């Protein structure tokens, strides 16, 4: 997914400030089983000054533990409001993706009464800007809908698309 993620950043970075967790080989690996420590590190290194988390969804994204960790940290209320949460399918998925469990727990098809929203790949910067603004507004208007009670994934899961563990 790295090529598509890089293209997304290149094409739309005028609309948002990219902070990417897990897309690059040189990203910090948070080697700990201490849930609190992992969430604090993600918050401090990647989310500290962000207000919206965009999950770019490839064919196997749903199986990756780092995605679960980033979503859990994003939804966590603490000294900051939780981040708004939105998902975007990457072009190679043909808009058919399996959502990460924690994302799906915060999403409803049709976007009625849910915290997270899921979108097909944007056709314009205006679309993306509108979606980001909606996700930011959700921090104040829909935070009561957040479902973030499940524990963090300890391991990568088996991909529902290809059957491999990533």
Identify the role of each PLM range.
Residues 59-77:
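Conserved TIR/SEFIR loop-to-helix hotspot centered on a Trp-containing motif
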Residues 72-105:
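A eukaryotic "domain-to-IDR transition" signal
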Residues 1-52, 144-166:
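Conserved N-terminal substructure of TIR/SEFIR domains
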Residues 1-3, 60-63, 93-94:
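Short acidic, S/G/P-rich loop/turn micro-motifs used as interaction or catalytic elements
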Residues 34, 94-166:
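C-terminal interaction surface of TIR/SEFIR-family domains
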Residues 55-59, 88-89:
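Conserved beta-strand segments of the P-loop GTPase G domain that flank and frequently precede/overlap
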Residues 5-6, 65-69, 96-99:
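A short acidic (Asp/Glu
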Residues 13-18, 77-83, 112:
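Structural alpha-beta junctions
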């Amino acid at each position: 997914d790295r090529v598509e993620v890089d293209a997304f950043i290149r094409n739309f970075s005028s609309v948002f400030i990219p902070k990417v967790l897990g897309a690059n080989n040189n990203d910090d690996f948070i080697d700990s089983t201490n849930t609190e420590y992992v969430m604090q590190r993600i918050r401090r290194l990647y989310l500290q000054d962000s207000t919206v988390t965009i999950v770019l969804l490839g064919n196997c994204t749903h199986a990756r533990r780092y995605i679960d960790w980033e979503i859990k940290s994003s939804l966590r209320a603490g000294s900051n409001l939780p981040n708004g949460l939105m998902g975007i399918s990457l072009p190679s998925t043909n808009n058919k993706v399996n959502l990460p469990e924690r994302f799906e727990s915060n999403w409803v098809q049709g976007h009625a009464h849910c915290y997270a929203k899921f979108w097909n790949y944007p056709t314009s910067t205006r679309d993306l800007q509108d979606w980001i603004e909606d996700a930011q507004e959700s921090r104040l208007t829909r935070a009561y809908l957040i479902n973030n009670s499940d524990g963090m994934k300890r391991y990568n899961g088996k991909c529902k698309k290809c059957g491999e563990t990533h």
